[in-house]
Amino acid sequence: MHVPLGRKFDFDDGGCYVGGWEAGRAHGYGVCTGPGAQGEYSGCWAHGFESLGVFTGPGGHSYQGHWQQGKREGLGVERKSRWTYRGEWLGGLKGRSGVWESVSGLRYAGLWKDGFQDGYGTETYSDGGTYQGQWQAGKRHGYGVRQSVPYHQAALLRSPRRTSLDSGHSDPPTPPPPLPLPGDEGGSPASGSRGGFVLAGPGDADGASSRKRTPAAGGFFRRSLLLSGLRAGGRRSSLGSKRGSLRSEVSSEVGSTGPPGSEASGPPIPAPPALIEGSATEVYAGEWRADRRSGYGVSQRSNGLRYEGEWLGNRRHGYGRTTRPDGSREEGKYKRNRLVHGGRVRSLLPLALRRGKVKEKVDRAVEGARRAVSAARQRQEIAAARAADALLKAVAASSVAEKAVEAARMAKLIAQDLQPMLEAPGRRPRQDSGGSDTEPLDEDSPGVYENGLTPSEGSPELPSSPASSHQPWRAPPCRSPLPPGGNWGPFSSPKAWPEEWGGPGEQAEELAGYEAEDEAGMQGPGPRDGSPLLGGCSDSSGSLREEEGEDEESLPQLRAPGGSESEPVTTPVLRGLSSRGPDAGCLTEEFEEPAATERPAQPGAANPLVVGAVALLDLSLAFLFSQLLT
């Protein structure tokens, strides 16, 4: 297997990165572990950030999918001990569409926002019941439809404060129950009931659970009646007569369609309990607030029991109408699931007028409930469509998760291949803040994280660091890389050499000698292995040997003709970059190139041919003069 360019970093907090490396950042396949092997990301990296891979947390939970800028973004699958989410991710949180499933059978498919159900969605409960409608911040809120399963299949509710199966993955801790009020036994109509069944008739368990203690048994109501009898000193009626009159008023209210009696009229006569058939189902359509039936809505049971009107906290509360299976009705104002009539009657208005006002309010409530049903049915259709889209996203996320697992496998294989080659970390010089002195810097210092910190277990990141003031040398675009066998950088022009390497005196003469040798066809020393001395360049960041901190071999030195001492031409510098920079950990080969200084042109050495010609001309002139004289 071809092993690509890679790096290994051991962090101070115990984390470690082994994998691909490019341009000073993690790139390609790599594995990063947290402190003490608490959490691991393995997969693909792109310019210092995770792109596609698998993150495994210390508790065993995992995420498989896409990443962007160090956060979960795109499609992915998250698995924990008791639930799984498959779908889209946005900014590291669940959203916008996905499917959440629990080992108990609870499932939600729909829209998400900031990690919670928000928008339209369908929730299927462990017993098979469903809710389709609107959501807000992880709770049922808006318009929706709750459909139960047959009564004998419905899940038995454990908590009397919750009357339907809620989203166990999004519910906050349940606050303590409020103190019971006089006349309220402290239980909701679904206390001990089954999921989806909240409608209570006169003979249901709710009617039986709302019985008060009779005056004969003593208690609050007996004391209140005694005190009221003492206060009403002008009336010469006995306690027994009061008790009898109260019973007569309550007995006349049961089964009536008008508003007789008052709220404080005493305990109702318990009706014989009527068992719910095992095949009975119940459906509620209407408004929801904070995960409970609140507002206008209609609840109907398959045996004919029906309520239309106002709701509050999963109870009939406000004005509404109840229709019994036998066709009889009761209507009026409800409070905590019981029919009341606004306190003791003190006015002298005719009974028909008072009934007419209550009837008008009931009709308005029924009309509002029916409008709410229509709106809830529309939201139900939208929620079903969004759930179908979420299922498609879940399938796509599962496919991406498979690719992420394969990328993680490749990353671990490459890390295993790189591990033996990167066992011995090198040491490189690092300039301090003053830029004058150097100190050894271990190769295993962090090069991809800021301040030597590894990412948290939730989301491992390789953030982009600010650019370092010591940047690695890069070849100009016009130059081509060296062929195999050469690893030297280009030499600077003689005019650019600093003053301390030679001035216009002795060093200038030596330079003139070099130029004379070139004109005469003499060849200077070339680089080893037959590679050209000038024009080529090699990026030291592409060499594993240099990254591991091996020493550079010395370059050959040029000598002046006839001279015994060599003069330095140029020296490669291993530049150690700041560990806080994005290119930290890269050993780069740089050459000192100070500003060029212009030198006066020096006359070249005398040409032997010219000297010979001049000498011959002198001899010829001398011969001619001698002939003339003779």
UniProtKB/Swiss-Prot annotation:
Low complexity: compositionally biased ranges: 233-243, 455-469, 530-543
Classification via Gene3D superfamilies: Histone H3 K4-specific methyltransferase SET7/9 N-terminal domain
Region (Disordered), start-end ranges: 160-216, 233-278, 420-604
Top-level taxon: Eukaryota
Keyword Cell membrane: yes
Alphabetical list of InterPro entries matching this protein: Junctophilin, MORN
SMART domains: MORN
MORN repeat locations: 17-39, 41-62, 63-84, 85-107, 108-130, 131-153, 284-306, 307-329
Membrane topology summary: Peripheral membrane protein; Single-pass type IV membrane protein
GO biological process, one term: neuromuscular process controlling balance
Keywords: Cell membrane, Endoplasmic reticulum, Membrane, Repeat, Transmembrane, Transmembrane helix
Pfam families for this protein: MORN (PF02493)
Broad class of where this protein is predominantly found: membrane
TM stretches of this protein: 609-629
GO cellular component labels: dendritic shaft; endoplasmic reticulum membrane; junctional membrane complex; plasma membrane; smooth endoplasmic reticulum
Similarity comment text for this entry: Belongs to the junctophilin family.
Function: Junctophilins contribute to the formation of junctional membrane complexes (JMCs) which link the plasma membrane with the endoplasmic or sarcoplasmic reticulum in excitable cells. Provides a structural foundation for functional cross-talk between the cell surface and intracellular calcium release channels. JPH4 is brain-specific and appears to have an active role in certain neurons involved in motor coordination and memory.
Protein's name according to its UniProt entry: Junctophilin-4
Species of provenance: Rattus norvegicus
Lineage start: Eukaryota, Metazoa, Chordata, Craniata, Vertebrata
